[in-house]
């Protein structure tokens, strides 16, 4: 799931959320907005078992995927588009 909240100016707060049944262990959101760097936006487990991380982004198009332990890649069906290159987010 992806939540978007428009902030003052041209920034949007984007919250990425994975369900409880996602693979165990650390998961990072990696994408064009962070140089595809694992660990830079690591997801935090919430009390309800979901995992989230929030980033602020200016307008644009961003490719991203979730990277789980063991090199497991996950896409987000809530993205604006999903294809063989991953998920696409339009702000």
PLM feature segments, named:
Residues 1-10:
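N-terminal edge beta-strand
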